[in-house]
Amino acid sequence: MYCRRSQLKKPSMSHRTHYYWIAHQGTPLHGVLSIPGDKSISHRAVMFAALADGTSRIDGFLEAEDTRSTAAILARLGVRIETPSFTQRIVHGVGVDGLQASDIALDCGNAGTGMRLLAGLLVAQPFDSVLVGDASLSKRPMRRVTDPLSQMGARIDTSDDGTPPLRIYGGQLLRGIDFISPVASAQIKSAVLLAGLYARNETVVREPHPTRDYTERMLTAFGVDIDVSTGCVRLRGGQRLCATNITIPADFSSAAFYLVAASVIPGSDITLRAVGLNPRRIGLLTVLRLMGADIVESNRHEQGGEPVADLRVRYASLQGTRVPEDLVPDMIDEFPALFVAAAAAEGQTVVSGAAELRVKESDRLAAMVTGLRVLGVQVDETADGATIHGGPIGHGTINSHGDHRIAMAFSIAGQLSVSTVRIEDVANVATSFPDYETLARSAGFGLEVYCDPA
């Protein structure tokens, strides 16, 4: 059954309706597109505003399932949040010591960022909490966060295999630590820094590779004194946050699908407005340019403390490349889109050092390799990457594994298919990009949404 857009306004993986896409060749992409607000920044903005003294206004908030889950949890903890419009939030902060206990488990849905950051916040509270998630989030590793928090004096229980739910015991006295992160992860860093706000003395986080600095930039915007140097962040405990107004830029990870689509669909010429270009987020932009993409920045400025620019993208004949391993942490969420760009390019594209893809919402490495093979693309899989051999893209049915980024990536592949590509289990796109189909079709995608009773 074909589904009207109104039926898909707020789909959920818990619904009994099964949603799928049929993607096929459309027209060259054209137009000026406004991408929704950055998901990572939206999580942090509403969370830090809740901890601030005073009232904060957030513009450009991402209205999606993941960010709604975080906002709903904060409301459950006693924070009053108003929604004057779809992309605005007015947050009446309660201060660092004003959160209240919840009498039910706090449901993060599919939001891994929300769960990990909230863990860092809740370990410092005087009350117990339980963080739960959906089936996908309940399979994701959490010890990488709970271990350093435990070193700070927190008490957290996970399931036997280190996955959610997280049972957090309040009333613990936290101490600052000098933590060397075993992996490059902004979520780990952010959880430790949030706990560090409540800890005695100084908290230091050292990283093997610099990661996204959204937390550092936003804490500064809220008046927190934080020292940042290459690969190292220092935070003194006991500081308070001051309310401020935040304008959130467009999400680069969401823009990535249009960057790739316009680069590989002949005749395309689009402009993406006010896209966030955090230096630790734009590895894909660098790699696409290495492949010969025609992407031009203009109107560069700062928005919400983040570098922002308009991006004009025109079709170009891409060439395969070897992805520099030092860029992998800066594009970890964009690899599904890159794999499709590689399939459309001439020659081979080699990815290595990307084992982290196996512990995202799905095993993204396996999902992309399997899906491209279904479409007739030659791909050689390794433990931490793959070699993609560019060539014609065929037709077939793709299992997205309920992963929003896998689904959106293969919608691009469908535009290059000799026939059609059916993409199963796409409701979870609402976690990050609820209006994806509407925007894609307006730009020229051939993309229909269907639903069947499960």
Swiss-Prot record:
Domain of life: Bacteria
Record keyword Amino-acid biosynthesis present: yes
Regions crossing the membrane: none
Residues that bind 3-phosphoshikimate: 39-40, 44, 185, 187, 333, 360
Keywords tagged on the record: Amino-acid biosynthesis, Aromatic amino acid biosynthesis, Cytoplasm, Transferase
Catalytic activity: 3-phosphoshikimate + phosphoenolpyruvate = 5-O-(1-carboxyvinyl)-3-phosphoshikimate + phosphate
Localization in the cell: Cytoplasm
GO cellular component, one term: cytoplasm
Signal peptide: none
UniProt-listed Enzyme Commission number(s): 2.5.1.19
Disulfide bonds: none
Pfam name, any one: EPSP_synthase
Keyword Transferase recorded: yes
Binding site for phosphoenolpyruvate: 39, 112, 140, 187, 364, 405
Active-site residues, as the UniProt record annotates them: 333 (proton acceptor)
A Gene Ontology BP annotation from the UniProt entry: amino acid biosynthetic process
Broad EC category: transferase
Pathway, per record: Metabolic intermediate biosynthesis; chorismate biosynthesis; chorismate from D-erythrose 4-phosphate and phosphoenolpyruvate: step 6/7
UniProt xrefs under NCBIfam families: aroA
Function: Catalyzes the transfer of the enolpyruvyl moiety of phosphoenolpyruvate (PEP) to the 5-hydroxyl of shikimate-3-phosphate (S3P) to produce enolpyruvyl shikimate-3-phosphate and inorganic phosphate.
Subunit comment: Monomer.
Family to which this protein belongs: Belongs to the EPSP synthase family.
Name the record gives this protein: 3-phosphoshikimate 1-carboxyvinyltransferase
Organism encoding this protein: Xylella fastidiosa (strain Temecula1 / ATCC 700964)
